[in-house]
């Protein structure tokens, strides 16, 4: 009997010790929480964690992480995950969050160490066929000697393409915006040109011209939109000339094109979309696609990461990219965002939530390839536009009822 009582006393003593430890840990936890709360509330506002901070962390996480978190709570999500998405590398994720090094993006190893490397810090939001971090759209300012002496334009090439465009059979559009000009096309880097437009020129850095340049593509795109019943205005303000007169460098181009866009928005209440046309600096193998046996200049969409309208403009660009992939596979190189330190990162896209920046082809593409690209881009844009008009009309009728 005495042995049994001793055993019971020992058990009680052990249980009592666990309870004391639990209470102690609880009190310590409360103290830590109060101390952390005091530290966080005493920090200066700019040092406190904010929703933006957590958004930035979440932005770094790949989508499959969130999919797996949902799967842990609801196993039905597992059926929608492909075999390749069935697991993610925790070690890679930890490395990326701790060091900002992405093993799939070699730029992250040296991006903060090399001066000027941030200019190439473009993010792929949606990749087109064959697009990766080694062949993204690139833009480079013109050498000073290009601005000092004008290259001779290949007028025969330009006249030939314009004649073919004028003689092309065009059916009247089934629907139209009437007299309303709903699209405004402009060219921030208006001197960007293409080597086939310049006589005897082979140096890609010299692909610049005051007349034979990307504004010709703006004309093509505007005319193609008109043929789809969408009223478009093509603005050819010489931004480079304005920079030269004011003694400003090339990086200030958007400062000079901004008033052009503001004036357009203020003077035309029917305006719905503003589109900035550019040319890529890459070579032909990256900027050309063969679709049904015909050669096209590829199209890239760039969204300003620093713009307050980033989400809305990205939605439009992604919709156009997906339509292109469906109707013209390989035409779109993808949707990209830019907004690194030292980069403009806005591109006038803060002025409206329907702003686009399109890059048509690269330095080696000819007018025939560019014309096909402009026609295709207008085709998918018109499909998106008229579908949206139907939805708006239907919602308007519903409100009336």
Curated annotation (Swiss-Prot):
Disulphide-bridged cysteine pairs = none
UniProt lists compositionally biased (Basic and acidic residues) regions at 146-160, 168-179
Q: Keywords assigned by UniProt?
A: Sporulation
Its BP terms in the Gene Ontology are: sporulation resulting in formation of a cellular spore
Q: Which superkingdom?
A: Bacteria
Q: Where is this region: Disordered?
A: 131-179
**Stored NCBIfam families:** spore_II_P
UniProt protein name = Stage II sporulation protein P
């Amino acid at each position: 009997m005495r042995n049994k009582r001793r055993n019971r006393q020992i058990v009680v003593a052990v249980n009592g010790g666990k309870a004391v430890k639990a209470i102690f840990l609880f009190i310590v936890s409360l103290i830590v929480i109060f101390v952390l709360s005091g530290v966080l509330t005493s920090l200066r506002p700019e040092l406190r964690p904010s929703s933006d901070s957590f958004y930035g962390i979440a932005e770094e996480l790949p989508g499959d992480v969130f999919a797996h978190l949902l799967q842990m709570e609801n196993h039905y999500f597992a059926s929608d995950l492909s075999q390749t998405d069935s697991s993610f590398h925790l070690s890679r994720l930890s490395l990326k969050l701790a060091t900002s090094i992405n093993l799939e993006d070699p730029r992250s190893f040296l991006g903060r160490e090399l001066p000027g490397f941030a200019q190439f810090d473009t993010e792929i939001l949606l990749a087109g066929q064959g697009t990766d971090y080694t062949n993204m759209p690139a833009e480079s300012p013109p050498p000073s000697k290009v601005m000092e002496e004008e290259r001779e334009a290949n007028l025969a090439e330009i006249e030939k393409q314009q004649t073919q465009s004028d003689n092309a059979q065009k059916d009247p559009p089934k629907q139209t915006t009437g007299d309303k000009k709903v699209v405004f096309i402009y060219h921030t880097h208006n001197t960007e040109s293409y080597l086939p437009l310049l006589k005897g020129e082979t140096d890609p850095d010299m692909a610049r011209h005051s007349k034979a340049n990307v504004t010709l593509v703006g004309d093509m795109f505007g005319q193609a939109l008109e043929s789809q019943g969408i009223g478009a205005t093509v603005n050819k303000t010489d931004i480079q000339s304005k920079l030269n007169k004011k003694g400003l460098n090339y990086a200030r181009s958007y400062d000079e094109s901004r008033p052009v866009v503001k004036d357009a928005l203020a003077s035309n209440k029917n305006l719905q979309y503003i589109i900035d046309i550019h040319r890529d600096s890459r070579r032909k193998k990256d900027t050309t696609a063969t679709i049904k046996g015909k050669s096209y200049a590829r199209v890239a969409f760039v969204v300003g990461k620093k713009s307050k309208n980033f989400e809305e403009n990205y939605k439009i660009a992604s919709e156009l990219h997906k339509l292109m992939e469906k109707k013209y596979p390989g035409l779109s190189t993808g949707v990209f965002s830019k907004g690194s330190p030292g980069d403009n990162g806005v591109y006038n896209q803060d002025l409206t939530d329907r702003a686009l920046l399109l890059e048509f082809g690269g330095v080696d593409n000819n007018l025939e390839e560019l014309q096909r690209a402009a026609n295709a881009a207008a085709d998918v844009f018109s499909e998106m536009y008229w579908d949206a008009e139907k939805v708006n009309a239907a919602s308007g009728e519903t409100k009336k009822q």
